[in-house]
Structures are given as C-alpha cells and as structure tokens.
Amino acid sequence: MTSELQQELQILRSFNYTIEKLTDGLSASKEKIKSFETSINNSNRLIQLWSSVLSQTEHTQNLILNSDWKGLSFDNEELERLQHQKMLQIQAEEQRKIELQQEQERLEQERRQKEEAIALQKQQQQRLLRSKDPKVRPARRAASSYVPSRPSHVPRSSSMNVRSRVSMATTSNPNSLRTPSSSFASHRQSAIPKSATSSAPTIPTSNLPSVASSIPNNGLNSSNRKSIISKTSSRLRPPSRVSNVPSVPQHPSTRSRTSTRETTQPPFTTNPSNRSKRTTLR
C-alpha cells in the first residue's frame, strides 16, 4: 500500500515539474509577444509615414505637371473664397428664415384687419337695419315731418277769427283788399294774446254800433255780429306795451309799411265815412 502511494506521489511531482516548465515557457512567450507588438506598432507608423510621403510626392508631381495651377497664393485665395461663400450661404439661410417669419406676421396682420373690417361692416349693417326697423321709423318720421300750422303762442281761436274776418271783408268789397304787408301786420297784431295787452288803455265802445252797421250782414245773425264787434274792438287796442311775448319775425321793409298802414288805414274799412268813424274812435 505504501509503495503504491509513493509511486503516485512521484507521478504527481513529475506533473508539477512539467507544469512549472510550461508556466515558465508561457511567461517567456508573453515577454516576446510584447516586444513583437512594439515592433509591429513601429512598423505601422513607418508605413503610414511612407504612404503620406508617397501621396505628397504624387500631389506635388500632379501640380508640377498641371498647366492650370497658378501657385500657392492662388490656392490660398481660392480657399478664402470658399470659406466666404460658405459664410454667405449661412447668412442667406438666416435671412430667408427672417423673411419667412415677417411674411407670416404680415399675413396674420392682414387676416386680423380683414376680420376687423368684416366686424365693422356687420356693425354698420346692424345699425342700418335698426334705423330701418318699422318700430323706430314712424316715430322718426313724425318727429321730422311735423310742421306746426301756427306759432305755439298764437291761440287757435284768434287765427280762425282772422281768417273769417278777412273772408267777410273780401266778399263784401273786393276792391278793399289790403296789400300783403298790411295783412301780415294785421296777422301779427292778432297773434298777440289779450293777456299781453291787458295793461293798455281800452277804447270806449260807445260808437261800436256804427262800426257794426258798416259791416255787411252776409247771412250773420246779431250774436255773431256782436262777437265780431267785440273782437274788432280788442284788435283796435294799441300793441305798444307788449311784454314777455315772442313776436313773429318781420321783414324790415314790411315793418315800416305796417306802421303807416296801421295809423292811416284801419282794418275792414269799406267807405270814407267808416274811416272817419274809426279815426274818431282812435
């Protein structure tokens, strides 16, 4: 048993010795491989240098053989030109972007202006439709087309009485028609209300029957004639003291005529005898 174990021990020792030699050989080969790697790198650098020298030699030969080559200075200028051209291209690209942005802003502004114009046009159309609305138009027509038939301070009864008296005088004596200035003056005098002349002295009405007898009947009864006489007596009052009453505008030429006609020719005179009677009353 012991002999067998010793034999096996000897075999293992021989294996160990062989392995140690193998490891020593591998370590030696490692160092050799490193040196081989270094030599390969050096040879690679030499090959690259040689290839660059060959390429430069070939390029120089081509330049020498090229008849269009103008020298190194021209090559430098050409290189600068290419760089400047590249810079211009970059600037043109930036300018194009800026112009595109400005064009978009302009289109946006035009679109907003069109929208504002359309909105304004719609507002104007709505205003026109409101102005043409039948609920609003009658009131405006009434306000614009209304013309007063007489001044606001003139009573309706006075204007009607003036018309009736003028028509009576015209039918009784067509030759006794007054001029437009005198009729305008009489209408102005009749436009003054009785309250404005209340402070003026009144004329006694003792001689009024003679005036009534001078006015033709023309189908009027005694009550109508008395009302006309009372109204004519109120019209004979001098309108000298008039206060706080707006007067009717009168042309300057007709103003002078009115004053002379009122003093010389009383209204509704039909003959000289009546004129003398009216003068006596005054």
From Swiss-Prot:
Disruption phenotype: Sensitive to thiabendazole and osmotic stress. It is found in: Nucleus; Cytoplasm, Cytoskeleton, Spindle; Chromosome, Centromere, Kinetochore; Cytoplasm, Cytoskeleton. GO terms for cellular component: cytoplasm; DASH complex; microtubule; mitotic spindle. GO terms for biological process: attachment of spindle microtubules to kinetochore; cell division; mitotic sister chromatid biorientation; protein transport along microtubule to mitotic spindle pole body; spindle attachment to meiosis I kinetochore. Keywords: Cell cycle, Cell division, Centromere, Chromosome, Chromosome partition, Coiled coil, Cytoplasm, Cytoskeleton, Kinetochore, Microtubule, Mitosis, Nucleus. Residues 75-130 form a coiled coil. Residues 118-128, 144-168, 195-206, 233-264 have a biased composition (Low complexity). Pfam families: DASH_Duo1 (PF08651). Residues 118-282 are annotated as: Disordered. The keyword Lyase does not apply. PANTHER family: DASH COMPLEX SUBUNIT DUO1. This is DASH complex subunit duo1. It comes from Schizosaccharomyces pombe (strain 972 / ATCC 24843) (Fission yeast). The gene is duo1.
